[in-house]
Amino acid sequence: MPDLLIELFSEEIPARMQARARGDLKKLVTDGLVEAGLTYKSAGAFSTPRRLALAIEGLTAQSPTTREERKGPRTDAPEAALEGFLRSTGLTREQLEARDDKKGQVWFAVVTKPGRPAAEIVAEVLERAIRDFPWPKSMRWGSGSLRWVRPLHSIICLLSDESGASVVPLEIEGIGAGNTTRGHRFMAPDEIAVSGFEDYAAKLRRARVMLDAAEREAAIRQEAANLAFARGWEIVPDEGLLSEVAGLVEWPVPLMGAIEDRFLALPPEVLQTSMKEHQKFFSARNPKTGRIEGFVTVANIETPDHGETILKGNQRVLAARLSDAAFFWENDLREAKAGMADWAEGLRSVTFQSKLGSQADRIARIAALALEIAPLVGADADQAEQAARIAKLDLRSAMVGEFPELQGIMGRYYALEAGLPEPVADAARDHYSPLGPSDAVPSAPVSVAVALADKLDTLTGFWAIDEKPTGSKDPFALRRAALGVIRLLLVNGVRANLGQTFAKARPDADAADLLAFFHDRLKVHLRDQGVRHDIIDAVLSMPGNDDLVLLVNRATALSDVLKTEDGTNLLQGLKRAGNILAQAEEMDGVEYSFGADPKFAETDEERTLFAALDKAEPAIREAVRLEDFQAATQGIASLRAPIDAFFEAVQINSDNQILRRNRLNLLSRIRDAGRLIADFGRIEG
């Protein structure tokens, strides 16, 4: 069984596109091979800035022979029908078989297709993959029609086995497949002939090309850590930057430098962001001081001076960049110390959304809402309002203009320079959080108040102008904002009536529709934590469903009890009681909720169930009143055994109508006991 090696060698592939391109190449080729009848043992895709490669082991040498039977017209059908059938099968009349059918004799065509050699199939599949490759952006070059991310120079397409290797005959736009590639652009630019994947990977390594992106990442991570350790520093983790840099180099050579003393007073976030965004440097931190004092740059070449010239050049560019940052910082500090009034005035001319006014209008709404929310989260109301009014002023600062990702972070520095209390400054930094499902959730009361007000103003505002998420489209990130509100409420245990809060934020918003949207997002959030959607539906029908903390406490307690054997059996009993009642009420035209009388109990099982309900109902009610849903669910679970025994021993639909009605009313008590906690009829199972 041969192995297949493919390499597509081109000019530099953007780093951000490489991971997806590896997956696309593997899928396009392997799916095409399997569809054509070939199988394989394993496949792996690789990338460097100048190449995409695919190695497939254990490919079958040819596709299997196939035999297809096709039913045609009756033997006495008109000649035109027979001729059409012959054209569709490519056979002659003599090659058809007449067979008996329930409608008479019918022509059958048996079409045998011999297997095709792997090389023929590979050539077709690879050409189609190259022409249909889904690059996010592509280009044409020269006079050809082929599109690729950057000009494509050469193709390796090689089948190899124990007897040797052969090039698959293939040519695309004048580029013929071969068995040669090139090494590192500067250190080993000559052609390299290869005979298979192992030979290919080994020769590339000797030619200063590290083929595996994961290996390049590991090499950068380890060497950067070693360089930092030698100076008593540590590398600030940044997996996104690591992945990007690994896609920029074929032979990573990390080099470490120090930041000039005159820049060390800049906030560490400014240093880190400037170095990352402008130069793709990793930041090195002094663990004793917390300051960013050094950097690691990753060269793509080994030099006789061990990178000294490269490092000096990078330090010159870095000094220029940090000089700009220092200029922004100094100017911003002067404005902050003056009270930031000019920034506040400037936001009047910045439109937030055409129907929702300026950023200044938005800030006024957030401040008013933060004042309302403050008591719910235990925040100082004056500080919450003050924090809301200054939290977005850094949007007008020069630093945030240069580095938008520093919004909020710089706001804290400027608030402190303005002499504002630390809780107010912290809220300026934290009010955008959480930005995603894994982002940290603020816990300081003032920060929580402003973060909630910010997100709720956004949500109620867009609901008021009917700009809601639709399908996969969510241009204003409203789903993320709703998840942020949910996490802020749940993590901090904030007891808020969302319906009332929506009305205070924006009376013209459709509060019921927005609450339904929150419930949908809550289902997604809890599903990730192992709570089923039907359990959420069951508790949503209960009073207080706009208090998310209350709702989640109910749902998690119910989810826990339903995972037990008692809970599973109890659910069956409650659902059975509900189903029997629903059928009887529909048939009799009455609602059985008149109260069952124990004096009509004929069996021990009935009397036991009466006693169990008499004991459980008040305990469940009290537990629900105290919001102790663990105790409430344990109370309902205590009914499992008497309910099971009742259904086992008692005939509900007795011929004696007095007994029948009493037993149905007893079932009503069971249903009502369950409804103290949830609508069990909505739970699957």
Swiss-Prot record:
One of its GO terms (biological process) is arginyl-tRNA aminoacylation. It is found in: Cytoplasm. The keyword Heme does not apply. InterPro entries: DALR_anticod-bd (IPR008909), Gly-tRNA-synth_bsu (IPR015944), Gly-tRNA-synth_heterodimer (IPR006194). Its main location: cytoplasm. Residues 58-77 are annotated as: Disordered. It holds the Pfam family tRNA_synt_2f. This is Glycine--tRNA ligase beta subunit. The gene is glyS.
